[in-house]
Structures are given as C-alpha cells and as structure tokens.
Amino acid sequence: MATERQPECIMSQTQHCLESLGAQSCQEPPNASGDTQQYSNNPAHNDTAGPDDHLQQITCKDRHSPVPNHSQLSIHRYQVKKLRRLQSNGSRLAGPQRGRSYLKLQSFLDYRVQQRRGTCKDGEPVWSDELEDAFHQALEANPPMGRRNWSARGESYGRNELIADYIYRLTGKRRTRTQVSSHLQVLDSFLKGDPDWERLVREQPADHSNSQTQLVGPTRRSPINCLSSSHYSKDSLVCAVQCLGFGMWVSAPNMPDRIDDAFHVYTRLRRGQPQAPMPLEELTNWRTFFPHLNSLLLEVNDPLSCEIILLEARLQLMDVHPPTGSRLEIGLELDITNPTLGAAPMSNQRENWTCYNYIYEEGQKTMETYHNIPKPHTTRIRLPFESSWWAERFTMLTEDKQVAEASGHQHAAKERNQQFFRTLTAVQEIRASEPASLRRLHNQYAGSPSDGSKRMAIILWQFRQTLPIEVGTTICRKLIAAPGRTNEIYLPTPDLDSVRLTPLSSDPIPPSRSTPSMYQSPRTHELLQQHWPLYQPSHHHVTSVFNSAGAFDFTNSITKPEESLSDKTNSASMLDPFPNLQQQTTSQPTSLDVSSGAPRMLQIPDLPLPHTGLGAYGLGHESHLIGPDEPVGSTVGMSGDAGMNGARLETLLEDDLRVTATSQGTVLQDWQQGGSKNSGKKNPRAGDDAHTLEFTQTRAFTDSGYASTKLDNYGHIQSTRDIPTEPPAGPGYASGEQPEVPQTQNFVHVDAARTVYSDTSSVTSLQREGYISELAGDLFTKVSSWQPDSMTMERISEVLPELLRAFALKVGHNAPSQMHRDVMVFIHKNRE
C-alpha cells in the first residue's frame, strides 16, 4: 500500500495484558513517526496452555488520516494585531481588520526564501523574518501619505523615516530610510495589484468612501507599548495550530488500515463542529491534572508562548478481545502554520522536531517519553501517542471487565473503568528549532534552551468512557491563557519586616499550594521560587538571608560579629518544601548537633520517600543509571512532587557534600532485576531525555557577601526517563534497606559554611553618593521615558525597592567573584 506504516509492536493477547519492557523490538520503517518502545510478551497469569495454544497478537501503530477542520485565530495573534492600533495621535475610525493575503502569494514566498540566503556584515539576513514582520506592521501603522510629511517631536518625517523608526522601536535593529524605500520597491514589483498590498502602499482616492473618516496620520506608539528588543524575537510570532485529524481504532487482520474499515473504533475527531476557544481558567482543576502545563506557565526563563489545544476524547471500549493479528492504530495530525510565512514549507522554517509525552493518573505522572519526529515537508505534522501503552491499557480493561462479569460484579468493574478515565490526563509538548543558518545566538531570549528550540504547541488530553448508547468522539478546542500570566510577581505576606505589595497583573494566579504563614516553620526557598519568579531559582537554598520567622530580613543592616557563631544560620541546611505532608519515621535521627554545649545548628526534617500510586494499571519499573565518577550510589527520580529522604541527606552532609538540584526530587536506591543494585560502574545508555544532577563540595569560604562560597564540581548523577518512585517488592529485587552509617558527632567544619558580611568598605562616602546618584538617575531616565501617570509612578516607587533586592540576590548569590557580591551588598544597603 502507499500509506506510511507506523512502528508495529507485537503484544500478547492469550494472557490479555502486556508486560514490561523486553527484548522484542518495535521496528520503525523509514518515514514513520511513531513509538520506539520495546515490549515483551511475558505471561502475566498462570493460565493453562494447551498444545495448540499460541500467542494471539495485536499490532499497535500510529496511523494518521487528515481530517480538515476550521482554523481559528489565537489570542496571541489577536494581541499582536491589536498593538498596531494603539496610541493613535488623533481620533480615527478603524474599519474592519484587513488581512495580508499577499503574504501567501508564491512570488512572495520565493522572495523570502531568497532573502534568507543573503546575509549582511553581522551574518544575518538584511531582512530577516523578524524585521520582515516588523516592516509589515509598520506599513499598517503608518498609512500612505504621498509626499506629505508628518510632524513629530518638533521635526518633520516622511513615511519611510517613520517606518524605519517604527522598526527600530519594535526590534531594536536599525534600517535606514533608503533601505526601507528599496525594500518597498522590490516588494511592489511582484505584489502590485493585490488589494491588501495596494491599500498599504498607495493612497486611496479622496472620494473612495464617504462613510469613512479621513486618516489623521500614522499610528505613533509610545515606548511603553512598543516591544523592546530584548523581548521581541520569533518567539512572539505564535504559530497557528489546528487539529486536522485524530482517531483510535482496531484494524482486523487482512483489512485496510483506514478508520472507515475498522473492526472497532474507540474514538475519532468530530468533524464540522468547531468549538469556540475557552479560557484556561474555566478548565476544572487544570493545575492538578496537568502539572506540566502549570510548571510551564510559572517558568520565567522560558515563558510559554504557543497555542494550547485541548482534546476531549470519549472512548468506547470493547466487550471482547479483538481477533488474532489485529492492529491498534492511533492517528494524530496537526497543522502548524507560521503567521508570517503562511503556507511556506516547514522544512524552511524549523528542524529537529521533538515530542514530549506525559501521562498522568490522578495528577501523578506515570509515564514520560521523548520522541524525535521526522522533519515535515509541509505544514502538517504527525505525532506519536504511545500506542503500545494504550494497547496495554485496553487489554487490561477488557480482561478486568470479563472477570467481573463472570463473578457477577460487572457494575463495580464499570465504575472502576469510568473512574480510571476521569482521572486520566495527558500532555504533549511539541518543540522545534530554527535551522542552523538562521539561528541568531547573540539575540536569543534570555534563558531559552541552548539549542534554540521553541515550543510550537501544547496539547492537553482529557478522557471519558462513553455511555452504552454513545459512540466514541473527540472534540478539539483552543484554550486561552490569561495575558501576562508568566510575568506576575508574588510577594510574601506582610509581617514586621516586609511590605505588602499587590500583584502587578490584574488576573493573578492562585498558588497551587496554600500560602504559608510567616509564623510557621521556615519555607523560605519556596517564597523565593513562587513569589519572586523574575529571577532563576537558585540551586542552593540559602537560609542566612532570612530571619527566625522565615521572612525576608533586609530592612536592617547586617552587623553581626564574626565571633558570634551561635547566631549564624547554616547555609547548607535543607528545608522541607512540603511540611504539611504526612511524615514517616525512620531509624535515623531528625537533627544533627554541632556539639553538646552549643545550640542546635542543623535541623533537618525527616522527609519520606513518596509512594506514588499508579492506579490499577501501572507501568513496569525502569532503572536509573549512575555515572562512573559518582562516590555515592544514589539516583534522583524525576517524578513530580516529592521530598528528600532525611537519612540519605544526613549521610551526604556528613561527607561534606551539598546537593545541587534543579528540581525537587526523591533520593532513592537504584534497583535492578535479579537482586543487584546498580553500582555505578557502568552507564550503558543515556537517552536524549537524560537528566543530570551535580554534587558540589564546599571549599574556601570568604567573609564577604551572603552565604558566599566557592563551589567545585564533585561529580554528577545521570537519570533516564521517569520511573515509579516505589521500588517493586518480591523475588528478584534487592531489599531497599540502606546500610547504617555511623553518625559522626563532630560537625564543626559544617559551621564554616556560614558567612557574615563585614560592614567595612574601601569606597569613600563621595564615591558612594556618586554611585547612588548614577543608579537613581539611570532608573529615573528609564521610567520617565515611558511617561507613566501618577498611579503608575506610585506603584513603581512601591515595587522598585523589592525588585532591587531580588536583582541584588540574583547578581551576588553564589557569584563567582568578589565584585558581584559587593554589587549585591551595595544595592541592598542603598536601595531605599
């Protein structure tokens, strides 16, 4: 057949369930975009097999069938267009929004391909995609005015000068009036005659329309509404995404792979009934059921700037097992279109397409996979959706239903199945990167991935089981995230040492966890991460900058004497991020004392290992890998909210090690089948989705700055994929008991991690006043250029000291040099 075959995975049906990862491979033919999982057909039940019994096989694969659907404008593109009409100098009657049909002309697309090949002195195209889009926005904002000039800022400007100025304000890159004029002439040579182009480059006749008010002049936007160059990139050009087709069906042996000829259809995309976009906040409990999306919206360094699609699938289950040799097929196809380049081939726009799949049961992650997607040659892209995992689940559900019916408890089995699908959710994240020839590494958004990859779309999945009289259908709708969500600032609750500040955004996000009281046990690092998202969360949670109540204590000068060791706070102490969770007792002590005569220095709460339930149909265990240089045989599971084992943490602190982790994890022993632990001597594989944690050793502490330390790399731990955090019990697995490590009572060397800043300084008073004046003058110049009103100025004056404090922490905390720490302390002391 002339269809694209997807990878086929052979699964057992005699035992009516699929087992864990095995040796039988899933072969993927060329030009296929499907699963790369490996499964075995080990029996799960002790069924009696006759001599004529043989394994009945189900072949699962991803199959894609395009189904046209109506395209809708995203809220992001709407906001970009809305910016063009803001801040007009005169009253203006805006007519209906006109499109840019000329952007999809083949002549224009060919011209753009040619433009990307030529570069100027800085190695970039003269008219890159960013500048090209700004150029067309400038044409919209500055209507044709013939040979007349426009007066602004006491000078006269022609239209080409206004366009050049507009481009500079929008992108931070200068293009001269001559370059703008030349570009207009080139485009006009092959776009002349197009109505949308004509209205942008030529004046309309005076009697063109008696119902429209004559245009007063170009749209001049104040700098506060102009996107700065640091925030403008191709990330602001949100791609339009629509679901072309989706289906999940079973094909009988020797039957075509089309869904219309299916033996059974679990669900398929409903056609001809497009759903209106829905605000994300109207999606019930989305933070609980889609943890990955919640983390993306709270990310500051790589903010979410893509469309979000919600697919609600109603699944019609089978009453019996399919015939031998049947195939489970899943087809998911999207259309991803660049708003500037229209229907240009995707091969010219992006490369290195990847898809991350996350499956959750009751909000707990049970599966995380990573797939490389073949490079598309059109705007259509086909995505894998874990067909092997679904085949396993469907087989188990059918078997459970048959067993319940045989025992007369079919109603209970039905309720279990319905509850399973109600709590089952999934998230798919599609990413791609620019071609190497178009990457502008020096102009990338701060904090973006080093490979230049960008999120193209986020797909959310909800599932339900159909009623007896229903058929399986899937509906697709777009979700609208509140604008400015990722830029919100959460400040600590007020106390004696803090000032209450209202959130900057008019649509605040309620935190997923209740706001901690300042009179509870300290949870200071959570305040830093949740209430101060404007700087990257530190890998080391420093407690020396907080008072005993757990709040910020920057209002008073730090003048503690160096010899007052009992008043210092240990910067290496680890705090419990989830004190409200039920704690489990262990054999290890919950605190470590410096000496019998001194106050207790290091308080480490006993943190339990999480036991995440995987539901009725959990996946098999996957092992973690330890690098060859690791002195400690432990790994960190990357599965959701979890604490750190207190006993293991104390052991690490005894060895004078500090854990540097980019996310909350679980310290547990690596398990392998056969009763042996991974000793860390071999690292046979480390996939594309491997995570790395580093250990650092504390050395050469200084006496300047807050918790200033010099950290040397000690080693690293590698972890591949997500696994259940509870090690399986039973024969074939080693015991989870850790050998007891003798407790060491001498912890005086840990006390050296604390640092008290000395108030002495070599800067004279005159120099200090000059620095303060220079900083204040620069800030005032930046703010006054925005021309804010009195209310905005009052708000800025309230927020600015706190922002300076956060900036000081970002500059000086764990800084590599003394200069950075001095800058931190200087700004902190003089920010008022």
UniProtKB/Swiss-Prot annotation:
Superkingdom as given in the UniProt entry: Eukaryota
Gene Ontology biological process terms in this record: conidium formation; sporulation resulting in formation of a cellular spore
Main localisation: nucleus
Spans annotated as Disordered: 24-55, 561-596, 665-689, 718-740
A GO CC term assigned to this protein in UniProt: transcription regulator complex
Keyword set includes Transcription: yes
SMART domains given in the database record: TEA
Function as written in the Swiss-Prot or TrEMBL entry: Probable regulator of conidiophore development and conidium maturation.
Family: Belongs to the TEC1 family.
Protein known as: Conidiophore development regulator abaB
Biological source species: Aspergillus oryzae (strain ATCC 42149 / RIB 40) (Yellow koji mold)
